[in-house]
């Protein structure tokens, strides 16, 4: 009985969250499929921030070729940002959900249970991140745009020399 109730609850929770989020960036459009069945709080947070226009105009402040691109910090320093909950929220790990391919969308953090508004998109498999960052979606369109962003010239701190921005983020 408890399993049935949990399955019904997760199904209802999933229905409340948009299945796709679109980023119009300086390099083109990226579409993400969210996975609320894997990370309901992270998806709710991401969708809530998108609905508020939080990501509009924010830059990808950290780009490491052969690893990932990171954004979601309104200060552009890698130290800012806040969740819709007004405080950091807990990690959501599933043993069978792994960083096994490029295009994984995950929460950036400063350690355990410190998720806020920052996220990253992998450009290669990154198994060393399993159990360290909450995976909550993946790129379903625009991996070519992710590749363009990945290849932007950066400085010694992995910051793009020319600003790379999320012009507009919205639910599909």
Please give the residue ranges for each predicted region:
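Extracellular interaction modules
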Residues: 1-4, 161-163
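Sec-dependent N-terminal signal peptides
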Residues: 3-13
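Cyclophilin-like peptidyl-prolyl cis-trans isomerases
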Residues: 11, 15-172
């Amino acid at each position: 009985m408890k399993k049935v109730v949990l399955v019904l609850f997760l199904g209802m929770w999933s229905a409340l969250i948009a299945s796709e989020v679109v980023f119009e960036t300086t390099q083109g459009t990226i579409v993400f499929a969210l996975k609320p069945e894997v990370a309901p709080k992270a998806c709710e947070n991401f969708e809530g921030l998108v609905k508020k226009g939080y990501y509009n105009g924010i830059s990808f402040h950290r780009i490491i070729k052969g690893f990932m691109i990171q954004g979601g910090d309104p200060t552009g320093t890698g130290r800012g940002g806040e969740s819709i909950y007004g405080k950091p929220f807990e990690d959501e790990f599933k043993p069978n959900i792994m960083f096994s391919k490029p295009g994984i969308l995950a929460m950036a953090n400063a350690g355990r249970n410190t998720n806020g508004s920052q996220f990253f998109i992998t450009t290669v498999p990154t198994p060393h991140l399993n159990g360290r960052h909450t995976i909550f979606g993946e790129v379903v369109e625009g991996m070519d745009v992710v590749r363009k962003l990945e290849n932007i010239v950066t400085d010694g701190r992995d910051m793009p020399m020319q600003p790379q921005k999320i012009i507009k983020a919205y639910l599909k």
